[in-house]
């Protein structure tokens, strides 16, 4: 779908401090998430990136500052409505499963919304098909591979037709092939659905998939821009403890001039 350049989410001067902690986890964080685009929020462990996801959906409440959703500032009372529009896929999908088999798990959110049975069956079948898991609709989620489990988690989110999908380290437990397959699926979802993707990750290879990158370091926005801009600053990425994508490491070893390069681009160059 053609990208809409308006912003679906905005954080303005947001601070956050966990109860009992002396230090703030987030300090004066401000950024915008463009609608219908893929924004990657990257940083090492402890940079505050996952806390941002919790603030967006109201799992935690900002200590100071404003969070805006669809042009409207949100209060503590609004988060139930926000959760109607935002779906999250976590690092370990096991923690999200509630159904005994795949199709029941995908149906869970729809049941909570009192969707009529026949309509529910239609939505569940389509959502499972969208993630390529039709053959596993009657399987137990816990019997699936890591990549398959994440596909089921995504199907459960898609069934509710969210405006935003947040992937919170969703690929960190997957092998390289499963990770690549899941990223292809997310690209397909972005291309065919009216949805904004927010990927929270320490994996810069995953961040290459996005349209926009926000770099977090020690609870602040360190830098942001498109992937080409961010990944040209190799020194900055290394200084804050982020591991360069494999394609860029090889590019460096071979002495090529361009710093930003995808795996496909490196193959073409070789």
UniProtKB/Swiss-Prot annotation:
Cellular component GO terms held in the UniProt record: ATP-binding cassette (ABC) transporter complex
Claim: Nucleotide-binding is one of the keywords in the record: yes
Keywords associated with the record: ATP-binding, Cell membrane, Membrane, Nucleotide-binding, Translocase, Transport
Gene3D superfamilies given in the database record: P-loop containing nucleotide triphosphate hydrolases (3.40.50.300)
Binding site for ATP: 43-50
Enzyme Commission code: 7.-.-.-
GO MF assignments: ATP binding; ATP hydrolysis activity; ATPase-coupled transmembrane transporter activity
InterPro entries: AAA+_ATPase, ABC_transporter-like_ATP-bd, ABC_transporter-like_CS, ABC_transpr_CbiO/EcfA_su, ECF_ABC_transporter_ATP-bd, EcfA_1, P-loop_NTPase
Subcellular location: Cell membrane
Pfam families reported in the protein's UniProt record: ABC_tran (PF00005)
Membrane topology: Peripheral membrane protein
Annotated ranges, domain ABC transporter: 9-243
Protein purpose: ATP-binding (A) component of a common energy-coupling factor (ECF) ABC-transporter complex. Unlike classic ABC transporters this ECF transporter provides the energy necessary to transport a number of different substrates.
PANTHER family for the chain: ENERGY-COUPLING FACTOR TRANSPORTER ATP-BINDING PROTEIN ECFA1, HEAVY METAL TRANSPORTER
Subunit and partners: Forms a stable energy-coupling factor (ECF) transporter complex composed of 2 membrane-embedded substrate-binding proteins (S component), 2 ATP-binding proteins (A component) and 2 transmembrane proteins (T component).
Similarity comment text for this entry: Belongs to the ABC transporter superfamily. Energy-coupling factor EcfA family.
Protein name as it appears in the record: Energy-coupling factor transporter ATP-binding protein EcfA1
Source organism of this protein record: Staphylococcus haemolyticus (strain JCSC1435)
């Amino acid at each position: 779908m053609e990208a809409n350049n308006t912003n679906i989410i905005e954080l303005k001067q947001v601070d956050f401090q966990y109860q009992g902690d002396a230090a703030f986890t987030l300090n004066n964080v401000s950024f915008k998430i463009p609608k219908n685009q893929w924004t990657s929020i990257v940083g090492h462990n402890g940079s505050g990136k996952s806390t941002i996801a919790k603030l967006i959906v109201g799992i935690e409440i900002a200590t100071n500052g404003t969070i805006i959703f669809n042009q409207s500032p949100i209060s503590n009372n609004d988060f139930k409505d926000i959760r109607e529009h935002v779906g999250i896929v976590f690092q370990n999908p096991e923690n999200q499963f509630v159904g005994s088999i795949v199709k029941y798990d995908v149906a869970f959110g729809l049941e909570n919304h009192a969707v009529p049975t026949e309509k529910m069956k239609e939505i569940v079948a389509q959502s499972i098909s969208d993630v390529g898991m039709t053959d596993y609709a009657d399987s137990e989620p816990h019997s699936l591979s890591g990549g398959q489990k994440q596909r089921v988690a995504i199907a459960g989110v898609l069934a509710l037709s969210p405006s935003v999908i947040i992937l919170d380290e969703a690929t960190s437990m997957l092998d390289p092939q499963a990770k690549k397959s899941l990223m292809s699926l997310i690209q397909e979802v972005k291309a065919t659905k009216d949805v904004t993707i927010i990927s929270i990750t320490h994996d810069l290879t995953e961040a290459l998939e996005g349209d926009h990158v926000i770099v977090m370091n020690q609870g602040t926005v360190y830098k942001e821009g498109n992937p080409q801009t961010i990944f040209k600053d190799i020194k900055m990425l290394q200084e804050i403890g982020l591991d360069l994508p494999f394609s860029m490491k090889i590019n460096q070893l071979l002495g090529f001039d361009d710093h930003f390069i995808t795996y496909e681009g490196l193959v073409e160059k070789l």
